[in-house]
């Protein structure tokens, strides 16, 4: 993605455009020295952090940008897209377009001529959200992008090795089928569905989402947006789906989406969860928004780091 050096005027313009308020760390009870120490440790460890924004109690209290990355330039967020997809599913459920226990196969009769495997027939929307689809192996975004045939058709060819709803296996195939289901019931792409319901109310502009061979957004990846947009996703969930006094996500949805489903992996509805109550949207190379409801805080970072464990 094309990048350039940001001038002070460009930085000021980007801050004004994102609609987020700023305050000194101390005003929000945040230790500025600890932030500097964190950034110093990242640098000393040789970790390539591209940007960082920290928000607490209504204010951005710290932000950092590594040359040549800029706050006004969208970047590929990789699997963070999954958490945006979860928002769309929550909205569609509230709209009565489908239910969590609806079977995935029921939306694609044209792809399933003949008998359907029993376990495949049992797979639900909730199984897709929690990545418990029973697939024998994971399917990454890179695998999807190499296919020029229908990704929906390919999904139904993946062998089912476990009963859906029982075993976690991280797979972008689940996210793609959620996007495909949404398109089937709305006649819109996932991106178009979210635009007036989420992106515009959050002040997210200039975002782009890839389209697969079926004319469907991948759901699990392919979304480009700014670091501030990533931060807003986390803030929205810290605030229980409310933005500037208006409810954007259905009441109760955030609690369901960020609660762990199953063991040993504590995964929600396309959100990674932790025992302390925090939760994260995470993309490859640490594109990440981690929300800490107990502190009223969200941290958004982007970078080229292999594994979030290197940061926390």
What are these regions (language model features)?
Residues 76, 95-133, 157, 186-225:
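Active-site helix/loop module of the DD-peptidase/beta-lactamase fold
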Residues 58, 75-101, 128, 178-182, ...:
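Active-site SXXK
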Residues 174-181, 221-242, 287-304:
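Active-site-proximal alpha-helical segments within enzyme catalytic domains
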Residues 39-69, 289-290, 296-300:
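A short, well-structured edge-of-sheet supersecondary motif
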Residues 1-29:
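Extracytoplasmic/periplasmic proteins that interact with beta-lactams or build/remodel peptidoglycan
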Residues 206, 251-299:
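Active-site Gly/Thr loop motif
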Residues 133-211:
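A small/polar active-site loop signature that marks catalytic segments
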């Amino acid at each position: 993605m094309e990048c350039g050096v940001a001038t002070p005027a460009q930085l000021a313009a980007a801050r004004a455009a994102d609609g987020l308020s700023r305050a000194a760390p101390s005003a929000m009870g945040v230790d500025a020295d600890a932030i500097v120490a964190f950034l110093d440790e990242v640098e000393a460890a040789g970790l390539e952090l591209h940007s960082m924004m920290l928000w607490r109690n209504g204010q951005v209290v710290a932000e950092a940008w590594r040359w040549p990355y800029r706050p006004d330039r969208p970047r590929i967020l990789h699997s963070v897209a999954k958490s945006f997809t979860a928002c769309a599913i929550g909205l569609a459920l509230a709209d009565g377009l489908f239910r969590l226990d609806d079977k995935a196969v029921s939306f694609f009769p044209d792809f399933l001529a003949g008998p359907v495997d029993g376990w495949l027939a049992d797979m639900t929307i909730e199984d897709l959200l929690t990545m418990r689809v029973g697939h024998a192996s994971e399917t990454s975004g890179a695998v999807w992008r190499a296919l020029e045939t229908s990704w929906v058709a390919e999904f139904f060819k993946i062998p089912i090795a476990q009963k859906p709803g029982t075993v976690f296996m991280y797979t972008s195939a689940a996210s793609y089928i959620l996007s495909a289901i949404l398109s089937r019931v709305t006649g819109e792409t996932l991106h178009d569905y979210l635009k007036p319901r989420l992106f515009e109310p959050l002040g997210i502009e200039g975002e782009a989402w890839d389209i697969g061979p079926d004319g469907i957004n991948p759901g699990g990846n392919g979304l480009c947006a700014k670091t501030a947009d990533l931060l807003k996703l986390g803030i929205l969930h810290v605030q229980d789906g409310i933005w500037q006094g208006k409810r954007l996500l259905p009441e109760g949805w955030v609690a369901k989406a960020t609660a762990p489903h199953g063991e040993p992996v504590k995964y929600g509805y396309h959100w990674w969860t932790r025992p302390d109550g925090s939760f994260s949207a995470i993309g490859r190379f640490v594109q990440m928004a981690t929300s800490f409801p107990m502190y009223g805080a969200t941290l958004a970072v982007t970078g080229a780091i292999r594994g979030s464990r290197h940061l926390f």
